[in-house]
Amino acid sequence: AAFFIDSEIWPNMILNLKKKKIPIILINGRITHKSFIRWKFFENFSKKIFDNFNLCFSSNKETVNFLKKLGAKKILNVGNLKFSQTEKKSEKIQENLKKFFKSKKVWCASSTHFNEENLCGLVHKELKKKYTNLLTIIIPRHINRTPSIKKDLNKLGLKVHTQDLKSKIPDDTDIYIVNAYGKTKSFYNYCKSVFLGGSIINHGGQNPLEAARFGCKILHGPNVSNFKEIYTFLNQNKISSKITSPKMMSKILVKFFSKKSVSNKVKKKINNIGQKILNVTYKEVNLLLKNEI
């Protein structure tokens, strides 16, 4: 069998696989409204492609509706497979950083995009009135933007330090920029209040489950269309909060600072949902393949 994942659908490959009578399965299918409009523009071609799927596992109800309209026949709404991911142990933060963080009130802005860092800078200035030892950690989505981020934050009158293992971090640092890839989990393990970027700008948001599994309380903007059902679950369990302004973000962060991190009960709930989705997926794939062979 051939498996296509998420929204990675390759028409030529699908047509060739069908000629060879190889079963085609869509796993964790996700069709956004934007991509549905694109597929719908070539309606006859789209139906020819989606009709070839022997089985489609949808990650949400919206995708079920779109898949039907695009010509897919057997569709199962099992939920988002991202619930089933497990987190490896995070790298440890260097001792000098750990020591520095211990004397600070720390929060983190992760996977930030253009303009979102400025919002975090304004939030920092507001919170600094209440927490004089505040430190804001920014992990940009694209680290090549670090110099321009630093410049913009300096214009707000903030003292910025970029990650450098050799140099000492000045005690009056306001913003610490992580300008290296693969370090996010280390900071989730340490910061329990996290803003996830790509959600103020119209990008569709970032997957929040990783942060939730590390026990973080999550802030996000209004644009989270890529992970709608996950954020609904997190909002219902009081793990995440939507923000629309620096003032609103500051208020919620004050609440987060006074609360405990996400409970083990909620983490277990996330894992149980993931296991159920995996079990249904395995069962249905095995049934299909038995019938096809």
Model-derived regions, located:
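Nucleotide-activated sugar donor-binding and catalytic core shared by glycosyltransferases
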Residues: A1-I293
